[in-house]
UniProtKB/Swiss-Prot annotation:
PANTHER family for the chain: IONOTROPIC GLUTAMATE RECEPTOR
Chief location category: membrane
Gene Ontology CC entries for this record: AMPA glutamate receptor complex; dendritic spine; plasma membrane; postsynaptic density membrane
Cellular compartments annotated: Cell membrane; Postsynaptic cell membrane
Entry's Gene Ontology molecular function annotations: AMPA glutamate receptor activity; transmitter-gated monoatomic ion channel activity involved in regulation of postsynaptic membrane potential
InterPro entries referenced in this protein's UniProt entry, alphabetically: Glu/Gly-bd, Iono_Glu_rcpt_met, Ionotropic_Glu_rcpt, Iontro_rcpt_C
A Pfam family recorded for this sequence: Lig_chan-Glu_bd
Glycosylation sites noted in the Swiss-Prot or TrEMBL record: 104
Name of protein: Probable glutamate receptor
All ranges on the Extracellular side of the membrane: 24-169, 257-419
Key words of the record: Cell membrane, Glycoprotein, Ion channel, Ion transport, Ligand-gated ion channel, Membrane, Postsynaptic cell membrane, Receptor, Signal, Synapse, Transmembrane, Transmembrane helix, Transport
Amino acid sequence: MDKGLHFIFCVVTAVLLLRESSQTGAMRNDDAMIKPNDLRGPEENLPSLTVTTILEDPYVMVRSAELEGYCIDLLKALASMLHFSYKVKVVGDGKYGAISPSGNWTGMIGEILRQEADIAVAPLTVTSAREEVVSFTTPFLQTGIGILLRKETISQEMSFFHFLAPFSKETWTGLLFAYVLTCVCLFLVARLSPCEWNEPKNEENHFTFLNSLWFGAGALTLQGVTPRPKAFSVRVIAAIWWLFTIALLAAYIANFTALLSSGSEQLSIQTFEDLVKQRKLEFGTLDGSSTFYFFKNSKNPIHRMVYEYMDKRRDHVLVKTYQEAVQRVMESNYAFIGESISQDLAAARHCNLIRAPEVIGARGFGIATAQASPWTKKLSVAVLKLRETGDLDYLRNKWWESSCLHKSREGWSPLQPQALGGLFLTLAIGLALGVIAAMVELSNKSRHAAGHIKKSCCSIFTEEMCTRLRIKENTRQTQETSGRANA
């Protein structure tokens, strides 16, 4: 009996111990699962850094209670290369870093100065004012200042001469020159070629200069017109002009169709000068950002106008966060001035947004550290290595990819003369061949005429050319008729 009770007691004790062990293991596994990825625990002999950052898409974002984004991936790569552990904290006041009215620094710069953080890994612009109080590494991203707009608010209305837009001014000028040159060549070749004159009594040529102009214009509209060329040389020029006009019309129709289907690319606001001259849109930037101080310190008259506008209306046009700025652009007549690289992402993810072409104030995003920090040099070298190996480009493509980019049309632009250079060259070769053929035809007739009237071929050729180019009428007597008259 005692042995039986002792056996039962041992079994129960073993079961309880196993259950407690399994529960402890489950709790440890749960702890491992909820451990956020912004915390890399201290390891043996590894220094630990406190990293301050700011929530901004796609640099740092919250996903399922964890931080992710471009800067988080960059931080992981740097920690792996330099062998340090880190703890990420979001900046308390939600600001990047500027001097407050009291003379103290706010944002991430202030946290580094107060030693609340060791480094700042964020889209933090390298400026001279910040460089005076903290140190920056080599920039990991290059950017500038651009204008973010909503397409519907700045689409340019079609002008009265919108039909001329498919070709640039230079192309239209080249086309007009090609038309006039071709008609002149038609007229001259028809005069020089004996086959284009009606014989035997009175030679008559239907290719007057006006008829040549009409013939060229008819080809531009794909319409057959009279007179019809008879000489081989004239037909060469006519054929090459027809081919030229067919290819030209195809290019015009294709580009005009692209123009009509991508009218949103024709922006009324292309530059900051356009922005300050218009009155339809309000514009502003992030309060306390480096962009605001760029315009404040600039000596450029246009930049000063931008700053004065924002300073007078700072309570209304300056925004607190980047997300607020994008939302305001989408919902109201508002243009946001900020980092061009962030605007590219907004335009990629919101297909009704677009960035104006002009970008000013080239700058870079760097990692901020305390002055005289030993980590500044190490982090700079690591950033350069990541750039050389293409890892920074990989991160850029990873976090800036968007379906909107694949759907967007290619930017439209008028056709330049360079795009049609081969076409104009082909026309020039055809005109040259036509003139050469006319000279050959005239020389053949001169050779036959020289045998009948006992003169040299060169003299007959010269007389014929001068006669055909001098006569004002479109009819002339043949050599036989003129010879009888002289007799």
